[in-house]
Amino acid sequence: MTNVPVSRLRNFCIIAHIDHGKSTLADRLLQDTATVASRDMQDQFLDNMELERERGITIKLQAARMKYTATDGNEYVLNLIDTPGHVDFSYEVSRSLQACEGALLVVDASQGVEAQTLANVYLALENDLEIIPVLNKVDLPGSDPEKIKKEIESIIGLDTSQAISCSAKTGLGVTDILQAVVERVPPPKDTLEQATQALIFDSYYDPYRGVIVYFRVTAGSISARDQILLMASKKSYELDEIGIMAPDQQKVNELHAGEVGYLAASIKAVSDARVGDTITLLNAPAADPLPGYTEAKPMVFCGLFPTDADQYPDLREALEKLQLSDAALKYEPETSSAMGFGFRCGFLGLLHMEIVQERLEREYDLDLIVTAPSVIYQVNMLNGEALMIDNPATLPDPQHRDSIEEPYVRMEIYAPNDYNGTLMGLCQDRRGEFVDMKYITTDRVTLIYEMPLAEVVTDFFDQMKSRTKGYASMEYHLIGYRKNDLVRLDVLINSDKADPLTTIVHRDKAYGVGRALVDKLKELIPRQQFKIPLQASIGSRIIASQNISALRKDVLAKCYGGDISRKKKLLQKQAKGKKRMKSMGKVDVPQEAFMAVLKLNS
């Protein structure tokens, strides 16, 4: 099965914005090449996770090997590497592009070029891939292929004279795509005689076989009984099996330069087989690893707490298992006076955070409270030390620190120009600094802003979508840290600090946020037998407060008429009891209150 000359191998991926039809096109390619029998076919075939199907997005990377007989009569082997399209998973995209020589750029013929498409196209151009433009959904009444071709030429600078029109839904133009892959994507370089090097572009955890690694052999060959060495983690393993994805796994004896396959070697955790790492042979190692390996760094942090304290061990176990298959997830234990025991987790972005939370609740049946997302701040201390802080509650007191720096991103928003004003307003509300505005076509515009990441990770994306009726798309990347006048805003409930509600905000916004927080809490916390003060403070200064008035029993109900001193005595006794209650009483804040306030926080 694997004795294919290198000249007949093609490795390619599909680049597309969310909802432009990437997974559907992958389905059609699998069907057209008879890789998957019609009876086994289901929509989004390569998206195995239930969550992926439901949200209609690709989260984990997949690969499939197809055989195709071209018009020249030769049989070619095409390796399709399916990539995620969302900004959070751009590191997954970058490494899968490294395993390819070509890419299909799929653009919705009714919507045009979107932000995510562009971000991934630039990654593909950096990797010197041959890009084939494909206009999808040409069967839709609103499609305008000629206009979109001009857009691709003006924005990306690609020649679209040979762009392929197709409809992944009906199967129109799919054969043209397969033929174009054979004719236009270059074959891998013939490096069979060199020392073995293979690039890991994905891995997942199998409870029975350990970690299954997806890799692309870039030089030399790997056989089923070799001993391998992972160059970044310096760990060696004996192979249990190697094989190809067609798209179900099939064992083979050997894979040589240019081929894509999987291996199992009783590897315990995904973190041992890092994506982007280089595999080589233990007895004849390559001199250098493949370039471009970087570790994915978490950008967004939040606390995860079980609603029921008894579920803490279950949450720990669930996170351990999830981390086996998601090397980008980081976590460490944390405690909070209000929430008990939980974990501080780091994610690549908001979608990643949502997906991890949803998988924990679904696959492990946990009930979770999630604190407001925060980013990593750099705190410069008076003694010259620089601290990196991801939990607002641990920010040092003002008298010990010199300044706080926060991460900034360069944000590009693509939208119809009718929504210019509302988008600029949104960016200014979020402390954005205007950089540039470019007209892509007569009716579409690109806005470029630099803004704090903390303002983006909350609900910026939702706001942008709702203000533009879903037409805008965005892409951002980190550009470094900048000093700002930031303060820690604490919330006190009955004089006790509620850690999960602590946030770091800009001084100009502190009063507005503090006022909104205490007002919201007043609505949500049930009244008690004693008065509860709610306060928002910066350091020792209270900037906003509210009171929840006490429930009061009518102690004078039995005194019809009678002496005033008797009534006074009863009222004083009640006041004394309430005073004692207030000093000893503990306010139970309901879960819904935390959830609602965290939404407001964001």
Curated annotation (Swiss-Prot):
Reactions this protein catalyses: GTP + H2O = GDP + phosphate + H(+)
Task: Please state what class of enzyme this protein is.
Answer: hydrolase
Q: Which GO terms describe its molecular function?
A: GTP binding; GTPase activity; ribosome binding
Please list the residues that bind GTP: 19-24, 136-139
Q: Which CDD domains match?
A: EF4_II, EF4_III, LepA, lepA_C
Subcellular localization, as worded in the UniProt entry: Cell inner membrane
Q: Name one GO biological process term.
A: translation
- Write down the Pfam families for this protein, in alphabetical order: EFG_C, GTP_EFTU, GTP_EFTU_D2, LepA_C
InterPro entries linked to this entry: EF-4, EFG_III/V, EFG_V-like, EFTu-like_2, G_TR_CS, GUFP, LepA_C_sf, LepA_CTD
Its placement in the membrane is given as: Peripheral membrane protein
Source superkingdom:
Bacteria
Q: Gene3D superfamilies annotated for this entry? A: 3.30.70.240, Elongation factor 4, C-terminal domain, Elongation Factor G (Translational Gtpase), domain 3, P-loop containing nucleotide triphosphate hydrolases, Translation factors
Q: Which UniProt keywords apply?
A: Cell inner membrane, Cell membrane, GTP-binding, Hydrolase, Membrane, Nucleotide-binding, Protein biosynthesis
Q: Name one GO cellular component term.
A: plasma membrane
- Which residue ranges does the record assign to the tr-type G domain? 7-189
Enzyme Commission designation: 3.6.5.n1
State the function annotated in the UniProt record.
Required for accurate and efficient protein synthesis under certain stress conditions. May act as a fidelity factor of the translation reaction, by catalyzing a one-codon backward translocation of tRNAs on improperly translocated ribosomes. Back-translocation proceeds from a post-translocation (POST) complex to a pre-translocation (PRE) complex, thus giving elongation factor G a second chance to translocate the tRNAs correctly. Binds to ribosomes in a GTP-dependent manner.
Q: Which family does it belong to?
A: Belongs to the TRAFAC class translation factor GTPase superfamily. Classic translation factor GTPase family. LepA subfamily.
Tell me the PANTHER family matching this sequence.
Answer: TRANSLATION FACTOR GUF1 HOMOLOG, CHLOROPLASTIC (PTHR43512:SF4), TRANSLATION FACTOR GUF1-RELATED (PTHR43512)
Question: What protein am I looking at?
Answer: Elongation factor 4
Q: Which gene encodes it?
A: lepA
